[in-house]
């Protein structure tokens, strides 16, 4: 298995994503936003940061980068796509995930560890966690308030697309939502950073199982 780790101007978690992929036992390669092909890749990791300086709004300029059409193609083919923080914002901007990310209710940048609950462990991203398991991931965002219409929220609930919730909501997200998947279950976006939760020495290794789950799910289908 080989992951593409996208790199935009202003990305700052691409190395963490790369490290997470390698740690889970697969290959990874950085892919510049100006590239036009993801041929040979089995999945996509879209890192956090401030792509294009967050001008216009978070993820807006990245959403029209040349590589995005290929991200959409892989998603349509059912390959795993994970967007974290700014990556989540990009996924909503390009329509692969519903909703939007707004300014935190506090209007402050929040950077700390947060306790989260796995509310759906039947996905390619969470199948190594227990249902209801509590995990610790770092958060680092100013625009992490997940918002959607009531209609979309009911669809998310009905399709079991909400996978991760905040235990103590730090940003005002609708129903404490921290992470969701698309209807097919192969595209995931979350504001917390599992790629920064790989070592107990750094405070938490709760994120290891998320990347291992992605690899496990892929191998079950292809090996």
From Swiss-Prot:
The UniProt transmembrane annotation reads none
Annotated ranges, domain Glutamine amidotransferase type-1? 3-223
List its EC numbers: 6.3.5.3, 3.5.1.2
Give the reaction(s) catalysed.
N(2)-formyl-N(1)-(5-phospho-beta-D-ribosyl)glycinamide + L-glutamine + ATP + H2O = 2-formamido-N(1)-(5-O-phospho-beta-D-ribosyl)acetamidine + L-glutamate + ADP + phosphate + H(+); L-glutamine + H2O = L-glutamate + NH4(+)
**One BP term from GO:** 'de novo' IMP biosynthetic process
The record's Gene Ontology cellular component field reads: cytoplasm
List, alphabetically, the CDD domains matched: GATase1_FGAR_AT
Its domain of life? Bacteria
Q: In which pathway does it act?
A: Purine metabolism; IMP biosynthesis via de novo pathway; 5-amino-1-(5-phospho-D-ribosyl)imidazole from N(2)-formyl-N(1)-(5-phospho-D-ribosyl)glycinamide: step 1/2
Any matching Pfam family: GATase_5
Nucleotide-binding listed as a keyword: yes
Identify the InterPro entries for this entry: Class_I_gatase-like, PRibForGlyAmidine_synth_PurQ
* UniProt cross-references to SUPFAM superfamilies, sorted A to Z: Class I glutamine amidotransferase-like
Name its cellular compartments: Cytoplasm
Query: Which PROSITE patterns does the UniProt record give?
Result: GATASE_TYPE_1
Q: Quote the catalytic residue positions.
A: 85, 193, 195
Going by the UniProt record, its keywords in alphabetical order are: ATP-binding, Cytoplasm, Glutamine amidotransferase, Hydrolase, Ligase, Nucleotide-binding, Purine biosynthesis
One of the record's GO molecular function terms? phosphoribosylformylglycinamidine synthase activity
**How does the annotation summarize its subunit structure?**
Part of the FGAM synthase complex composed of 1 PurL, 1 PurQ and 2 PurS subunits.
Question: NCBIfam families of this UniProt entry?
Answer: FGAM_synth_I, PRK03619.1
Question: What function does this protein fulfil?
Answer: Part of the phosphoribosylformylglycinamidine synthase complex involved in the purines biosynthetic pathway. Catalyzes the ATP-dependent conversion of formylglycinamide ribonucleotide (FGAR) and glutamine to yield formylglycinamidine ribonucleotide (FGAM) and glutamate. The FGAM synthase complex is composed of three subunits. PurQ produces an ammonia molecule by converting glutamine to glutamate. PurL transfers the ammonia molecule to FGAR to form FGAM in an ATP-dependent manner.
What is the name of the protein in this document? Phosphoribosylformylglycinamidine synthase subunit PurQ
């Amino acid at each position: 298995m080989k992951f593409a780790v996208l790199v935009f101007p202003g990305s700052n978690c691409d190395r963490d994503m790369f490290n997470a992929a390698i740690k889970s036992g697969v290959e990874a390669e950085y892919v510049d936003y100006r590239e036009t092909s993801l041929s040979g890749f089995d999945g996509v990791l879209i890192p956090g940061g401030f792509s294009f300086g967050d001008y216009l709004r978070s993820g807006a300029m990245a959403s029209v980068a040349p590589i995005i059409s290929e991200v959409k193609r892989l998603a349509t083919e059912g390959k795993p796509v994970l967007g974290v923080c700014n990556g989540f914002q990009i996924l909503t901007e390009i329509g692969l995930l519903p909703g939007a990310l707004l300014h935190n209710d506090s209007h402050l940048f929040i950077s700390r560890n947060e306790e989260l609950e796995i509310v759906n462990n039947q996905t390619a991203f969470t199948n190594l966690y227990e249902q209801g398991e509590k995990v610790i991931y770092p958060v680092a965002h100013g625009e992490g308030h997940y918002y959607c219409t009531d209609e979309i929220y009911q669809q998310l609930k009905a399709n079991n697309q909400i996978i991760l919730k905040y235990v103590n909501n730090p940003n005002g997200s609708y129903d404490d939502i921290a992470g969701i998947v698309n209807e097919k279950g192969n595209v995931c976006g979350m504001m917390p950073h599992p790629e920064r939760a790989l070592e107990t020495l750094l405070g938490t290794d709760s994120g290891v199982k998320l990347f291992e789950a992605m690899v496990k799910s892929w191998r079950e289908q292809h090996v």
